[in-house]
Amino acid sequence: MALSALLELSEKEYDAFASVHPYANFLNSIYSGRKFALLGWDVHYVGICRDGEMAAATLLVSVKLHGSYRYFYAPRGFLLDYADHELLQAMCQGVKQFAKERSGLYLKIDPYVTYQEHDQDGKVVEDGFCNQKIVDDLQSCGFAHQGFTRGYDMANQCRWMSVLDLRNKDEETLFQRFDAQTRWAIRRAQRNQIKLTQAGPEKLPDFMRIIDHTAARRGFDTQDETYYRELFQAYGSQVKLILAEMDLSAYQRALRKEQMQKQTELSEIQGYSCKRARHQKMLREELDQLQQKLREVRQLELYAQEGKVLMGGGIFICYGQEMIYLAGGTYGRFLHFHPAYAMQWHMIRAAKHAGMRGCAPIISTASADRLRKIRMVMAYLPSSAVFMRMSSNCWETF
């Protein structure tokens, strides 16, 4: 089967191939190309055909270095079958030649290929897959692997992702596969009247206050507001800004309704048996807790705007067959209301309804200790897996 030379593609041609490819990712999408263009990079879409059908493609961006030289980058690597060595070799040679003709000095790729499967504690899964051969093949094509780096690095793409597979599972199956603590927290958030709303870029200042608070509390770096505004500008409707708010009036009504039910139940079991005495004690303790929550409402009113208290938020990106939880946080004083659980369960359901195959939060470090610290709801799921991706940089020099 004959392979073509490297072809320049239109944005439309590239998107038709990329959006349905197994290695599709928001970072190798046309929306990513638009974002690079906003930042002043040159943007190209190139590919190779086999017998008239597109077989490989990539987003290729470049920026000027010193003199006339340019740095080239293929975000999340090439979209092709990495097991097809002939195609991989042709793509590598074609892209290298393309860059060389345009004064390329360096070419970097960070393939969106799972290297090895790990469990939720960051340990290698026995009998799990390992794609070392792809690393070897890329090296044979002239790339130099920079190693499986560890730690948090804002300059490079994440290497660890916790992935929830949504295929062949309905909502009830997904929910029941959560651990007991997660199911309890989701139900508790619903009882706490946590409501989820999708907002536009006008709400980014509110989101930034949340994410900056969370970053300071948890000790991680974050992007500035300009970064997220550029996301909205480039990705449009693919970006979902979700805000988790408490409906204060609904919460207060729910507490008073539960209080009345407990009081009625208590009055109906007045008696002297040991069993009833224990039940009465439990009800009185629950009534005390409800009264404390009602007093807490007065404090919550200090944070309310138009009857709602903003507690948390997150930014998600939908592209291809996956939804990525890019960034999010919760005000520390509201953690016990579990807004993050409500938000992530809401978006898992949204991804399922949209027919996506997976949902994943980005985990930007390879430290097992750090993994345990930063993983959120989806990382607690027994049905999720942690993958180390082959995104440690591969460099080609010319």
Place the predicted regions along the sequence by residue:
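Glycosyltransferase-associated regions of secretory-pathway enzymes
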Residues: S267, G271-S273, L283, S383-R389, ...
